[in-house]
Amino acid sequence: MAKTALKNKAAGKPKFKVRAYTRCQVCGRPHSVYRKFGLCRICLREKAHRGELPGVTKSSW
């Protein structure tokens, strides 16, 4: 889990817009965050398996 200080730092508006980065809304993870959902790959997978994301299905081919 992300430290509270880092979550707060990412939540504020940076002095320069290139310094802004996305964090997972659930766990605060800074890497591999899907912008469309606002979730990291791990939380996205867990929520999709539980059926909490409407329209998201496991791919099969």
From Swiss-Prot:
Residue stretches spanning the membrane: none
Family the entry assigns: Belongs to the universal ribosomal protein uS14 family. Zinc-binding uS14 subfamily.
Keywords attached to this entry: Metal-binding, Ribonucleoprotein, Ribosomal protein, RNA-binding, rRNA-binding, Zinc
Record's cofactor remark: Binds 1 zinc ion per subunit.
Name of the protein in its database record: Small ribosomal subunit protein uS14
GO MF terms, alphabetically ordered: rRNA binding; structural constituent of ribosome; zinc ion binding
Cofactor: Zn(2+)
Keyword Metal-binding attached: yes
Role: Binds 16S rRNA, required for the assembly of 30S particles and may also be responsible for determining the conformation of the 16S rRNA at the A site.
Positions of Zn(2+) binding: C24, C27, C40, C43
GO term, biological process aspect, one: translation
GO CC aspect terms: cytoplasm; small ribosomal subunit
Domain of life, per lineage: Bacteria
Any one Pfam family match given in the protein's UniProt record, by short name: Ribosomal_S14
Organism for this UniProt entry: Bifidobacterium longum (strain NCC 2705)
Assembly description: Part of the 30S ribosomal subunit. Contacts proteins S3 and S10.
InterPro entries xref list: Ribosomal_uS14, Ribosomal_uS14_bact, Ribosomal_uS14_CS, Ribosomal_uS14_sf
